[in-house]
């Protein structure tokens, strides 16, 4: 149940279409559901935070992921997002559920994507093609949470004209997710051009001294561009989630 469904339920009670006892029963069943000894699915998260629970697939047995997803569907959740999902687990889920799987981003989505809402458009940009898997995790997360997303890939600082050729897209964005490895310069450049929040995502792409993304992370943390926030290395999900929150603010 999300905020809209809760409002509809309360309106039905006010209109006399649903009795208070029936409404109380529906709400009573909502907080969480314990599945065996391995999970407690949080059904109230959509009411508290505006977004239902997301499944982090890494480290979970494929049978456990299936059990959690089934319980979410049973509770009425229409779109289920699964991040860090292995190809093996995805194939297992697809034998039982309508799962769309992006193997590069390791993202699975069960059900239909919601119609885009929010105040505007989210732009997801990358420094290089190698950053696309992380960027796609951000883009697919944002789309699964009900946002219109524009992808702007391979526009890094080694060929700045590629970014400048897309200034209209940059300037019209509501939020920008800038994904880069190596020295992590792209978010600073975008932050100096855009009048909207920029979410920087360092990736682990790079040679030895990039230290698995630490160099890009430190570069972004020390940026002189204002209005920029930084998430963890390779955390496309965190960036897409935050971008969605910003895009849905009144």
Residue map of PLM features:
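Short, structured coil segments at secondary-structure junctions
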Residues: 95-97, 193-194, 224-226
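Glycine-rich phosphate-binding loop
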Residues: 165-203
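Long amphipathic alpha-helical segments
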Residues: 1-86, 91, 95
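Glycine-rich oxoanion-binding loops at beta->alpha junctions
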Residues: 105-111, 150-169, 214-215, 231
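Glycine-rich phosphate/diphosphate-binding loop of Rossmann-like nucleotide-binding domains
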Residues: 118-161
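Short glycine/serine/threonine-rich phosphate/pyrophosphate-binding segments
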Residues: 63-65, 131-136, 160-161, 180-189, ...
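C-terminal binding/interaction regions
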Residues: 126, 130, 168-171, 175, ...
């Amino acid at each position: 149940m999300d905020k809209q469904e809760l409002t509809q339920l309360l309106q039905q009670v006010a209109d006399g279409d649903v009795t208070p006892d029936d409404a109380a029963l529906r709400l009573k069943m909502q907080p969480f559901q314990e599945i065996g000894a391995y999970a407690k699915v949080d059904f109230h998260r959509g009411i508290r935070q505006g977004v239902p629970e997301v499944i982090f697939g890494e480290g979970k047995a494929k049978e456990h992921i299936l059990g959690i997803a089934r319980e979410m569907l049973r509770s009425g959740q229409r779109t289920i997002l699964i991040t860090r999902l292995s190809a093996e687990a995805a194939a297992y889920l697809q034998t039982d559920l309508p799962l769309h799987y992006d193997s590069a981003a390791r993202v699975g989505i069960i059900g239909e994507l919601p119609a885009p809402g929010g105040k505007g458009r989210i732009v997801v940009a990358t420094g290089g093609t190698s950053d696309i898997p992380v960027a796609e995790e951000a883009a697919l997360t944002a789309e699964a949470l009900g946002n219109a997303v524009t992808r702007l890939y391979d526009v890094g600082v080694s060929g700045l004209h590629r970014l400048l050729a897309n200034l209209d897209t940059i300037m019209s964005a509501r939020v920008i997710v800038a994904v880069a490895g190596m020295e992590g310069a792209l978010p600073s450049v975008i932050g100096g051009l855009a009048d909207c929040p920029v979410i920087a995502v360092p990736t682990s792409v790079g040679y030895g001294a990039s230290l698995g993304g630490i160099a890009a992370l430190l570069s972004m943390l020390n940026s002189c561009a204002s209005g920029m926030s930084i998430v963890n290395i390779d955390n496309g999900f965190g960036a897409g989630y935050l971008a969605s929150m910003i895009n849905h603010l009144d």
